[in-house]
Design a protein with these regions (language model features):
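Helix-loop-beta segment of a Rossmann-like dinucleotide-binding subdomain
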Residues: 100, 146-155, 206-215, 263-272
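Rossmann-like NAD(P)(H) cofactor-binding subdomain of soluble oxidoreductases
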Residues: 60-144
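NAD(P)+-binding Rossmann beta1-loop-alpha1 motif at the extreme N-terminus of oxidoreductases
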Residues: 1-59
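Short, well-ordered alpha-helices that flank and scaffold nucleotide-derived cofactor binding pockets
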Residues: 20, 24, 28, 94-98, ...
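Active-site-proximal catalytic alpha-helix in oxidoreductases
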Residues: 188-216, 220-233, 259-260
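NAD(P)-dependent Rossmann-like dehydrogenase/reductase catalytic/cofactor-binding core
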Residues: 2-4, 31, 175-176, 226-309
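Rossmann-fold dinucleotide-binding core
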Residues: 75, 111-190
């Protein structure tokens, strides 16, 4: 049988954790090859010593089939798992083009609701799945990725509730590598459910320049949050995500459970003057609203203000 080639593009916390478990599981399997695409000092360390993966179940040193910044060394991929930041998606797609063949599946695992559509536009005719993950993992230093928190969910599927043999087979490949993977027929519901929290809270912690907890202690801030979530419900359901209005209470409950002073990654990036995911987490809602003919006045106001920063 032909070898199955799984390529992990982006070896930060998310890519490093899932890629590391895949490399660990299939190191001695002659039929499955695992490739890491990374760059810089991190790549050099992995090429020299392998990837060190620190998890709640122990610390492992894993070695992929190949770690490289030159995808032409890989050949045509069967599965490509992409984990860049949303603002790097277009350049990352351009990077992987040489390894995309007629039967390649591309699976983005990054924040946002428009990633798969963006990839399909850039790679016409390619089978693009959809996914999202719940995980706390980070790149500690070059060559070392650490996960914490005990949650590592890897959710994926194909749009319009499609099922095929490859989806089922891929779920098995992941589970055999001790990855908490679930194939969902209605993956849109899963992705949108996560997006309700990350989009609204990232946008508003940045807009108001406050912590998660402070979003709920002021009536104006809380009302703005509810308004954004109401706009999202209309858009998500127009897209077929089947979201109930109870999502508003769920987001508020999630915020209440978090330490008061914690904040979103996007807010931290704004404060540090770094590139942010404001388009993927805020602007994409405005664009989708325009496309669907659904007004998003709260999102539009927040997005326009954030663009000035």
């Amino acid at each position: 049988m032909d070898k199955i080639k799984i390529v992990i593009v982006g070896l930060g916390g998310v890519g490093g954790y899932y890629g590391g478990l895949l490399a660990k599981q299939y190191a001695d399997n002659p039929n499955i090859e695992i490739f890491f695409v990374a760059r810089g000092a991190h790549l050099s360390k992995v090429q020299a010593n392998g990837l060190t993966l620190i998890t709640e179940k122990g610390t492992f040193q894993v070695h992929p089939t190949l770690a490289t910044d030159n995808v032409t060394e890989i050949g045509t991929a069967d599965y490509i798992i992409m984990t860049p930041k949303s603002y790097d998606l277009d350049s990352t797609v351009a990077q992987i083009k040489p390894i995309v063949g007629a039967n390649t599946v591309v699976l983005p695992l990054l924040n946002g609701i428009d990633n798969s559509d963006r990839i399909r536009t850039l790679l016409p005719g390619t089978e693009v799945w959809q996914g999202c993950c719940y995980i706390v993992a980070r790149l500690n230093e070059p060559g070392i990725v650490e996960s914490s928190g005990g949650v590592h969910r890897f959710n994926f599927g194909y749009e319009h509730k499609q099922t095929n043999d490859r989806l089922i087979a891929f779920e098995s490949l992941l589970k055999e590598a001790s990855i908490d993977a679930t194939f969902y027929e209605n993956i849109l519901h899963v992705i949108w459910t996560k997006f309700f929290f990350i989009s609204s809270t990232a946008s508003l912690t940045s807009y108001f320049n406050v912590s998660f907890g402070a979003l709920l202690t002021d009536e104006t801030r809380k009302a703005t949050l509810v308004s954004m979530l109401e706009e999202l419900i209309l858009i998500a359901n127009a897209e077929g995500a089947e979201i109930e209005r109870t999502v508003i209470d769920k987001v508020i409950h999630q915020l209440e459970k978090l330490p008061f002073e914690t904040t979103s990654s996007m807010h931290s990036d704004f404060k540090a003057g770094k590139t942010t995911e404001v388009h993927g987490l805020t602007g994409s809602v405005v664009e989708l609203g325009k496309k669907l003919g659904i007004p998003t006045p709260t999102y539009l106001n927040v997005y326009n203000e954030l663009l000035k920063r």
